[in-house]
């Protein structure tokens, strides 16, 4: 069983993906970390985030161990990742890696921004997780503050808005929901309520596939 979870920044998709993977005992891949690790490699080496050749080389040479880097989830890396993710050759370089993971015997859970549309268009379950811009900004600001990083709400909200715009307008694999995805709005849901709602979506899909 392949479960594809897509959604914008701070919608809660990563948390839901991890919980579902644990529940169904499936491997989980946060595909956003691939782009974050690519961006981090460029920043560390002094490369240019908008140089297509440099970014593509970083993606092709990605070391899976780098996905464990402590600062991958920083806001700076997140913004940089959104820039390299708009480069077609970077997406192509990382696509095969993601598809190989999705082909894990028994299934897998992947979350990102183009899982249900590009990486796993035939996924058994597709969930598009969303939330209001204000709710997502509040969550991200709280997350940053919890790590001791600057988390000014207005700044965070504008950064998320800009990232949404970049992702939606990139030339390759623009961010959008799959036509057959089930929407889950987490604006007014806590983690447990969101998980229960996601679990209900998956269970319902399993029943339909079995019938």
Swiss-Prot record:
GO CC annotations on file: cytoplasm
A GO molecular-function annotation: ATP binding
Biased composition (Basic and acidic residues): 158-169
Binding residues for ATP: 7-15
Record-listed E.C. numbers: 2.7.4.25
Top EC class for this record: transferase
GO process annotations (BP): pyrimidine nucleotide metabolic process
Protein name per UniProt: Cytidylate kinase
Organism for this UniProt entry: Beijerinckia indica subsp. indica (strain ATCC 9039 / DSM 1715 / NCIMB 8712)
């Amino acid at each position: 069983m392949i479960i594809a979870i897509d959604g914008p920044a701070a919608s809660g998709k990563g948390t839901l993906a991890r919980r579902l993977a644990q529940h169904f005992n499936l491997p989980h891949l946060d595909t956003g970390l691939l782009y974050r690790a690519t961006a981090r490699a460029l920043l560390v080496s002094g490369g240019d985030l908008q140089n297509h050749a440099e970014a593509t080389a970083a993606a092709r040479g990605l070391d899976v161990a780098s996905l464990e880097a402590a600062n991958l989830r920083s806001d700076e890396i997140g913004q940089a990742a959104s820039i390299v993710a708009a480069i077609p050759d970077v997406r192509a370089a990382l696509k095969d890696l993601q598809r190989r993971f999705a082909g894990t015997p028994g299934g897998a859970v992947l979350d990102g921004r183009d899982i249900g549309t590009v990486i796993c268009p035939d996924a058994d379950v597709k969930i598009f997780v969303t939330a209001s811009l204000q709710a997502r900004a509040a969550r991200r600001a709280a997350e940053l503050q919890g790590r001791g990083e600057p988390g000014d709400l207005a700044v965070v909200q504008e950064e998320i808005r800009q990232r949404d715009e970049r992702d939606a307008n990139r030339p390759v694999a623009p961010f959008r929901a799959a036509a057959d995805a089930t929407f889950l709005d987490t604006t007014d849901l806590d983690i447990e309520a969101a998980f229960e709602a996601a679990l209900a979506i998956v269970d319902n899909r399993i029943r339909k596939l079995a019938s």
